[in-house]
């Protein structure tokens, strides 16, 4: 039985990375440094732009985050691909929250637009995931649109984020 809460702390997210939150067969979040959120502040099976589920999470920004030291020297900015990965992470987390089992894998995205950036002077990144469809058959898959905001300003959008849960990834 999955512990379906509306919010999760950093410790909860770290437990997910160790395979402890959604059970031995549930999907895991990555461990730091690839874990791209500090907390999940809202999870719901309704709501969002399509009323089919909604997730909101946050990442606290500080100049000491690992990517600012290498991307780019003298011009630090969070790589856009990390924001995209965070959205995929949250789609997979939601599938586990619903009780889905398997190893999460990003399957694609329809379109991504970057209209801003995350600098070391920012305070907070917010991720918003709006679910469009959940497939729960032999393959468990989530389809969603996502938004990334920095200090409450929209900077990335992604349409048709796809994540699947697989029992066996050896032939993937």
UniProtKB/Swiss-Prot annotation:
It holds the Pfam family FabA. InterPro entries: FabA, FabA_FabZ, HotDog_dom_sf. The keyword RNA-binding does not apply. The active site is at residue 71. GO terms for biological process: unsaturated fatty acid biosynthetic process. It catalyses: a (3R)-hydroxyacyl-[ACP] = a (2E)-enoyl-[ACP] + H2O; (3R)-hydroxydecanoyl-[ACP] = (2E)-decenoyl-[ACP] + H2O; (2E)-decenoyl-[ACP] = (3Z)-decenoyl-[ACP]. Necessary for the introduction of cis unsaturation into fatty acids. Catalyzes the dehydration of (3R)-3-hydroxydecanoyl-ACP to E-(2)-decenoyl-ACP and then its isomerization to Z-(3)-decenoyl-ACP. Can catalyze the dehydratase reaction for beta-hydroxyacyl-ACPs with saturated chain lengths up to 16:0, being most active on intermediate chain length. Belongs to the thioester dehydratase family. FabA subfamily. This is 3-hydroxydecanoyl-[acyl-carrier-protein] dehydratase.
